[in-house]
C-alpha cells in the first residue's frame, strides 16, 4: 500500500493533461474503473492483517476522493471551455451587412382576377362576394336545381355538416345578391369553388368569375356584346372571333358555350352563358315579366393559363417560388 500516493499523483497528472471530455473519461476508467489502479488497491485490502486494514482503507479512500475532486474540477473546466467555443461560433456579428429582403408579388391567378375585374368595372359592373361554405338552397335550389334534379349529377360536390356544401360555382353569390337587391343589378362574382376533380387541367379547388346583369329590356344581344368586348380586351385582339354554341344550364334559358378562335385557327371553349331562367328570378322575388337578365361564367385559372402560357393547372398551386417569381 506504499504506492497509493504515487498512483494518486499519476492520476491527478493524467487528469490535468486531458485535452477533452472523452480523454478525461478514459483517465477516470484507468484509475477508478472496474480494473482501475485505485480499485485494484481496494480489492487487496482483504489480504491485509485486520489491524492494518482500517488504516489502509482510509488512505485509499482519501486518494480516491482526491482523484474524484480533481476529475470533477477538470470536467467543469472542459464543459465551460466547450460552451464558450460554441457561443463564439454562434455569435452574431452585428457589424456584418444585413440580408436584403426579397420583394413579393401577386399570384398569377390573383393578377388575372384583378385584370378581369378591372375590365368589367369599366363596363359598369361591381364586384360581389359570398361564403365558400354554402347551403344546398343557394348552391342548387335557388338556381333552379331542385332535389333529385338530373343536373346535380353534372357536378361532383364536397358535402360538409348540416347538408351544407363547398360551393361548386360562384352562382350562389348572384342568387344572394338578387335576393337582397332590386334591379338594375350588374355584378361580377369571383371566388374559389370546389369540385371532386384533379388532373393537369382540373383541380379540386379552382377559381371562377361569374357575371350577372338584370334590368328591364336586357337581351341576348347585350350578353353577346358584353362578353365579346371583354374577351377582345382581355386577349388584346380587336379582331378576335367569338362564337356562341347552344348548350344547357338549368339556371339559364337560352344557354350557350363561349368559344374563341385561337391563333392556330382552333376554337377554344372559354366559358358558358345564357339568359337568366325566369324561375331563378322568381325565387329571388324579381318579377320575370318585368325584368330580364343574363349571366356568364369563366374559369379564372383557365384564363391565367391562356394569358401566361401555362400548360399544367397544378403549377399554380404547388407554391414553387421559382415558378411564381416569374410573374412578379
Swiss-Prot record:
Chief location bin: cytoplasm
GO biological process: phenylalanyl-tRNA aminoacylation
Cell compartments where the protein resides: Cytoplasm
InterPro entries: aa-tRNA-synth_II (IPR006195), aa-tRNA-synth_II/BPL/LPL (IPR045864), Phe-tRNA-synth_IIc_asu (IPR004529), Phe-tRNA_ligase_II_N (IPR004188), Phe_tRNA_ligase_alpha1_bac (IPR022911), Phenylalanyl-tRNA_Synthase (IPR002319), tRNA-bd_arm (IPR010978)
Listed cofactors: Mg(2+)
GO cellular component, one term: cytoplasm
Cofactor note: Binds 2 magnesium ions per tetramer.
Keyword annotations of the record: Aminoacyl-tRNA synthetase, ATP-binding, Cytoplasm, Ligase, Magnesium, Metal-binding, Nucleotide-binding, Protein biosynthesis
Alphabetized Gene3D superfamilies for the sequence: Bira Bifunctional Protein, Domain 2
UniProt binding sites for Mg(2+): 253
EC number annotated for this UniProt entry: 6.1.1.20
Domain of life: Bacteria
A GO term, aspect molecular function: phenylalanine-tRNA ligase activity
Catalysed reaction, written as an equation: tRNA(Phe) + L-phenylalanine + ATP = L-phenylalanyl-tRNA(Phe) + AMP + diphosphate + H(+)
Pfam families: Phe_tRNA-synt_N, tRNA-synt_2d
CDD domains, A to Z: PheRS_alpha_core
HAMAP family: Phe_tRNA_synth_alpha1 (MF_00281)
Family the UniProt entry places it in: Belongs to the class-II aminoacyl-tRNA synthetase family. Phe-tRNA synthetase alpha subunit type 1 subfamily.
Subunit structure of this chain's protein: Tetramer of two alpha and two beta subunits.
Name of this chain's protein: Phenylalanine--tRNA ligase alpha subunit
Protein source organism: Chromobacterium violaceum (strain ATCC 12472 / DSM 30191 / JCM 1249 / CCUG 213 / NBRC 12614 / NCIMB 9131 / NCTC 9757 / MK)
Amino acid at each position: 500500500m506504499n504506492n497509493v500516493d504515487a498512483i494518486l499523483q499519476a492520476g491527478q497528472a493524467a487528469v490535468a493533461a486531458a485535452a477533452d471530455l472523452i480523454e478525461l473519461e478514459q483517465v477516470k476508467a484507468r484509475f477508478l474503473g472496474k480494473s482501475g489502479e485505485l480499485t485494484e488497491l481496494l480489492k487487496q485490502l482483504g489480504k491485509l492483517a485486520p489491524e492494518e486494514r482500517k488504516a489502509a482503507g482510509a488512505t485509499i479512500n482519501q486518494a480516491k476522493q482526491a482523484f474524484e475532486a480533481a476529475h470533477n474540477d477538470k470536467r467543469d473546466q472542459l464543459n465551460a471551455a466547450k460552451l464558450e467555443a460554441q457561443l463564439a461560433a454562434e455569435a452574431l456579428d452585428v457589424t456584418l451587412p444585413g440580408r436584403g429582403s426579397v420583394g413579393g408579388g401577386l399570384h398569377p391567378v390573383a393578377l388575372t382576377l384583378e385584370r378581369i375585374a378591372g375590365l368589367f368595372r369599366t363596363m359598369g359592373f361591381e364586384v360581389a362576394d359570398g361564403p365558400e361554405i354554402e347551403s344546398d338552397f343557394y348552391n342548387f335550389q335557388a338556381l333552379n336545381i331542385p332535389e333529385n334534379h338530373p343536373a346535380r349529377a353534372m357536378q361532383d360536390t364536397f358535402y360538409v355538416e348540416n347538408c351544407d356544401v363547398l360551393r361548386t360555382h360562384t352562382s350562389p353569390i348572384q342568387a344572394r345578391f338578387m335576393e337582397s337587391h332590386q334591379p338594375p343589378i350588374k355584378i361580377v362574382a369571383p371566388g374559389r369553388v370546389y369540385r371532386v376533380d384533379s388532373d393537369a387541367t382540373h383541380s379540386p379547388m379552382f377559381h371562377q368569375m361569374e357575371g350577372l346583369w338584370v334590368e328591364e329590356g336586357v337581351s341576348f344581344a347585350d350578353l353577346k356584346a358584353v362578353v365579346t368586348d371583354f374577351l377582345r380586351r382581355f386577349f388584346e385582339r380587336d379582331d378576335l372571333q367569338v362564337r356562341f354554341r347552344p348548350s344547357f344550364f338549368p339556371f339559364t334559358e337560352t344557354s350557350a358555350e363561349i368559344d374563341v378562335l385561337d391563333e392556330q385557327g382552333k376554337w377554344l371553349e372559354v366559358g358558358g352563358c345564357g339568359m337568366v331562367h325566369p324561375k331563378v328570378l322568381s325565387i329571388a322575388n324579381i318579377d320575370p315579366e318585368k325584368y330580364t337578365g343574363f349571366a356568364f361564367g369563366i374559369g379564372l385559372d383557365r384564363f391565367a393559363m391562356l394569358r401566361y402560357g401555362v400548360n399544367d393547372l397544378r403549377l399554380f398551386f404547388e407554391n414553387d417560388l421559382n415558378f411564381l417569381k416569374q410573374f412578379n
